Amino acid sequence: MVNQYQEEKSQNVYCIIDKGRIMQMESMGLSMLDYAINSTLVLSNICLHKSDKIGLFTFSDKLGATLSASNKRIQLKKILEVLYAQKTTFQDSNFELLQQHVNDKVRTRSLLLLFTNFENPFTLQRSLPYLLQLKKRNLLVVVMFKNEELEQFSTLSPNSQRQFYQGILASKMLIEKEKMTK
């Protein structure tokens, strides 16, 4: 007797993109929102090729676009059209509003890929209760972005006292972010 592995198909996958103030930060010439959009498009294409259903939510201080999960070929075009017009806002993101909206719209257990960025433990602590609520009914994956320029800055040899302290501060910020991911 031989066991054969067979992938599950038609699973619901939702990409959730934060359009708040923190996503305006740039790294290597692109904003964090641009990276989130690019990642969403790649993941959407992969999900559709694997016969999974893909959906989309965007949010900031208000709710943005909502696309219900679907595995039709036109879904990628819909996602592309919605993401083309997305811009960041100058407000902090409202994770409570997101949690309520997702609980209203997503009826079955789904994979939620949340593209956001937490630069310090205080913003994470503020959002954590709502993320835990999302996790109760779904499988939540929080995707945070690495700031390559900050990493490069922390490893530079200082030429002045000011650069020395800036390097220490950059290293401290990187350590804090690393702690948040654990």
Residue spans for each PLM region:
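A general structural motif
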Residues: 90-99, 172-175
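Conserved phosphate/pyrophosphate-binding and hydrolysis machinery centered on Walker-type P-loop NTPases
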Residues: 29, 33, 69, 92-96, ...
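Von Willebrand factor type A / integrin I
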Residues: 122, 126-182
